[in-house]
A protein has these predicted regions:
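Amphipathic alpha-helical interaction segments
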Residues: 145-149
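Flexible helix-coil linker/hinge segments at domain or subdomain boundaries
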Residues: 150-155
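Signature for HUH/AEP ssDNA processing cores
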Residues: 1-124, 131-144
């Protein structure tokens, strides 16, 4: 099954700085690709390519280019575990191994990977990726999916 998402062509070996992030945000929404999940995992987790999971309808209005009113579809869900100071104080540390061995993750996640920030961090920083059975065209439904996942994994 091919999944549509926005993914850049540039391979990265480190986290982009704030100037690079702004440049990426200005063009990434135009870089729509259709890939199998294995190709997505390799692009993101191995090759460090920046991605945007949703695609959006084209608009001439710059401020609306990645706004919910132009939401087209999304089939991937990604949970970001940063173990920020606030999260640790509120929920404790969420480790990579704990999440990897969680029954829900074993049954439902496609892949997980450590982020660039993990390399210099004392705590684990990683992402877990899920693929939905079909492309979702309702922005609110995507929000509801995230809400339910955040209840399972509040940090």
């Amino acid at each position: 099954m091919k999944i549509e998402l926005c993914i850049e062509d540039i391979q990265r070996k480190s986290k982009p700085n704030s100037d690079e992030v702004r440049m990426i945000q200005n063009v990434l929404y135009k870089k729509i690709k259709k890939k199998e999940i294995d190709g997505i995992a390799e692009s993101i987790a191995v090759n460090g390519k920046t991605s945007m999971l949703a695609t959006y309808f084209e608009t001439g209005e710059f401020s609306e280019r990645i706004h919910s009113i132009n939401f087209k579809q999304q089939q991937l869900i990604m949970l970001d575990f940063d173990n920020s100071k606030v999260d640790i104080e509120k929920y404790g540390i969420t480790t990579y191994d704990y999440v990897r061995n969680h029954d829900f993750i074993k049954q439902n996640a496609c892949f997980m990977y450590r982020t660039f920030s993990d390399k210099e961090a004392i705590v684990d920083k990683f992402r877990v990726v899920f693929v939905l059975n079909e492309s979702v065209k309702d922005y609110l439904l995507i929000g509801n999916i995230y809400t339910k996942l955040f209840r399972l994994f509040p940090s």
